[in-house]
Amino acid sequence: MASALSYVSKFKSFVILFVTPLLLLPLVILMPAKFVRCAYVIILMAIYWCTEVIPLAVTSLMPVLLFPLFQILDSRQVCVQYMKDTNMLFLGGLIVAVAVERWNLHKRIALRTLLWVGAKPARLMLGFMGVTALLSMWISNTATTAMMVPIVEAILQQMEATSAATEAGLELVDKGKAKELPGSQVIFEGPTLGQQEDQERKRLCKAMTLCICYAASIGGTATLTGTGPNVVLLGQMNELFPDSKDLVNFASWFAFAFPNMLVMLLFAWLWLQFVYMRFNFKKSWGCGLESKKNEKAALKVLQEEYRKLGPLSFAEINVLICFFLLVILWFSRDPGFMPGWLTVAWVEGETKYVSDATVAIFVATLLFIVPSQKPKFNFRSQTEEERKTPFYPPPLLDWKVTQEKVPWGIVLLLGGGFALAKGSEASGLSVWMGKQMEPLHAVPPAAITLILSLLVAVFTECTSNVATTTLFLPIFASMSRSIGLNPLYIMLPCTLSASFAFMLPVATPPNAIVFTYGHLKVADMVKTGVIMNIIGVFCVFLAVNTWGRAIFDLDHFPDWANVTHIET
């Protein structure tokens, strides 16, 4: 039996890849309707995405092949979905993130903030979480985690080395004093105290490493380009509800998601404090207590790492200027509560010529123009070697670095999702699914939101968060229309819940990076992550039912969601 299972496991990928399409064929043969053929493609891609028998990006290209073959969409209609406005927005954000990483600006910001926060355990953890979340808003969660965890590890090792040296000194003193004590007065407390301190150190290591991957996942939810699911939502809104008129943009998303991120970050910090530090605030926060040697050692590590960076370079200053320019232009384009710069010359009737993608590509282009060194204008006093060098220094980015660092697979993954949404609309699958869900009209909207958010949070533990939102959001949009509910009331919380992969090392790259350092067991991640998932879902539920209602007018079924207004 065991050998048979081993044999099956060995050929699992082969079986899934070739047998799955054959098993699903009866669907198409028995019910040759167009929407059934579209469902066949979606189910097949969902299985391939969940099992990853072929790369996610390659699976995302399947609509280009299957939709024309099944006469769902012609090739031109499918291919155009892979380079839409939303894809360009995400691509521009990724290029800016590459520039920040290339010149180590993210590391400087992180170390400077941690030095300001201090080295007391609770404050240090809060500092790590705040910095990680802040960076994860703008650069990828994986890159943020990969940069932060080595800093955490260096601090933990230095603290452990200092504690070990202190214990060795105390042991020598105790041995000297033990000779003076009568036998009846010898109390064997040394090993117990040592074990207790060792357990405390292990708990601290677990807390410090977990806080990084949690903060990276939470931080990415705060901005529209912070993580893939957010961009999927924007693309699905533009595809399924073209009359929504830029309702979801950088400013409106930030107004909704950033406060939610802060609330979640606070609860995550409190939960980690409770599980691993037992809420000993006097000891871990350090109120009125003198710094211990291991805390001074941690501070020394941070100071040394910051010293290695040297003074702020010309390139870092220019990247910082470009970054602030990007954020300011995003926020001020169409803030909602006042006319933005968009209205000056780029609005004609109902048409808005400039989007957030335009801004992202503009700043991304600047990074290939702005110099990384100061240009030298003093030609008379130049040496022979200086005369040979080009007058204009190299730019902040070149295409070789950009090509290597940008995760192009995610761009294709987004395109695949938009192609599926287009195919669902064109084939009538969206309308059919909506009709099947009409009985949900009797269920309270709040209950629907809560249940579906929990479903997505569990599903994303096993599947890519982008693939999860790509599969679920069109279904939820159809369901919302069929029961007369504002689609964003369902789509917003489910999009955020797709980023709550806290339970398993394989759930998301930040979890995997943290797990490889050896401080955590799978049981530790599951035990802590289950409650984190619940915290995340309820925080989002709170956000949607409070300030989310005001920002997106979630109490009313909007005209832009009416099926008669949607082009098919």
UniProtKB/Swiss-Prot annotation:
It is a multi-pass membrane protein. GO terms for biological process: alpha-ketoglutarate transport; cellular response to lithium ion; citrate transport; fumarate transport; oxaloacetate transport; succinate transport; transmembrane transport. Changing L420P: Loss of localization to plasma membrane; loss of function in citrate transport. Expressed most predominantly in the liver, with moderate expression detectable in the brain and testis. High-affinity sodium/citrate cotransporter that mediates the entry of citrate into cells, which is a critical participant of biochemical pathways. May function in various metabolic processes in which citrate has a critical role such as energy production (Krebs cycle), fatty acid synthesis, cholesterol synthesis, glycolysis, and gluconeogenesis. Transports citrate into the cell in a Na(+)-dependent manner, recognizing the trivalent form of citrate (physiological pH) rather than the divalent form. Belongs to the SLC13A/DASS transporter (TC 2.A.47) family. NADC subfamily. It is linked to Developmental and epileptic encephalopathy 25, with amelogenesis imperfecta: An autosomal recessive disease characterized by subclinical seizures appearing in the first days of life, evolving to severe epileptic disease. Affected individuals have profound or severe delayed development with lack of speech, and most patients do not acquire the ability to sit. Additional variable features include axial hypotonia, peripheral hypertonia, and abnormal involuntary movements such as dystonia and choreoathetosis. This is Na(+)/citrate cotransporter. It comes from Homo sapiens (Human). The lineage of its organism: Eukaryota, Metazoa, Chordata, Craniata, Vertebrata.
